[in-house]
From Swiss-Prot:
PROSITE patterns: ARGININOSUCCIN_SYN_1, ARGININOSUCCIN_SYN_2. This is Argininosuccinate synthase. L-aspartate binds at residues 120, 124-125. L-citrulline binds at residues 88, 93, 124, 128, 180, 189, 265, 277. The gene is argG. Its EC number is 6.3.4.5. Homotetramer.
Amino acid sequence: MSDVKKVVLAYSGGLDTSVIVKWLQETYDCEVVTFTADIGQGEEVEPARAKAQALGVKEIYIEDLREEFVRDYVYPMFRANTIYEGEYLLGTSIARPLIAKRLVEIANETGADAISHGATGKGNDQVRFELGAYALKPGVKVIAPWREWDLNSREKLMNYCEEHDIPVDFSTSKKKSPYSMDANLLHISYEGGILEDPWAEAEEDMWRWSVSPEAAPEQPTYVELTFDKGDIVAIDGEPLKPHEVLSRLNRMGGDNGIGRLDIVENRYVGMKSRGCYETPGGTIMLRAHRAIESLTLDREAAHLKDELMPKYAEVIYNGYWWSPERKMLQAAIDATQDNVNGVVRMKLYKGSATVVGRKSEQSLFDASIATFEDDAGAYDQKDAEGFIKLNALRLRIAAGKGRQAD
């Protein structure tokens, strides 16, 4: 352990990572550098500075990464219409590559020997952080305290704080939160507590970002989203930065009861886990993006893209953002977005986000051909006869050989 002189820790300022600071100092006799990222978790990050200073930390990094997070990670993911196992919008998964990248960069800047994180040994995040770190810095040493220490309960962590004079607000810490929560600009997640029973309904007061659909306004909210190369660049005609887009859609969606999700998912480490999520802005973005693609993408390109999406989602969920396969898939996905431009009109009402209009100068929708009225010869319906016969040829041959379908 003596070879570790300096460690960069992903630090939230909470109970677990505050204990980790002191544990690293004592166990490894090393200097600790803390890194706190603001990725839109909705909490003040500056208090983490005072807490780190109280623990004797000299080098403290606190960074606003909201714009980089949405622009370089969330937006590329949404170009693929990414969902994991049919429902999950990957709000936690997509936040980890950026944090891993900055941990490695800060380690390089400060001459640190190792990086550390507070992810447990049961979850996916340990995998995501460490796969990212090894992809970016192959020789990096990673210290994962939850896989080393015996502080395996909240009570033990709090006792450790008392024994080592770690500044934690015990007036709130002794009241065990019923849920383990994680938030960023894309979503907030809830796990643990009563959610460990997959039959138990989540309590209404758990949800923090949205009103219940029943309590949402009686009048719908309409919003127009402008796309440029697959990314939303304006809301109701007002140009906005990516993180501003997501922040505003979160508010609009939450006010209308949109984006709640309760699922059991398959973790990469092998177990099933029940989680509840609120992704109001992301839910709106996904439906709007699919709508503008329906107007502008070629059919076969769209269908192939849909086939690639589950693999792309799995790659991100499992922590392989920095892998060759993710970069290859991203290149293919991005190549489809050149003409994904236009405006989508959405109706937000009591938990639903409904597309009610879409338009684009690159639209492949031709009303003169698609019309049910007189098309003035734009489409000769007689051509369909030969098309059908050619496509039925293999079926007719098989049937003629006695291979009738059951």
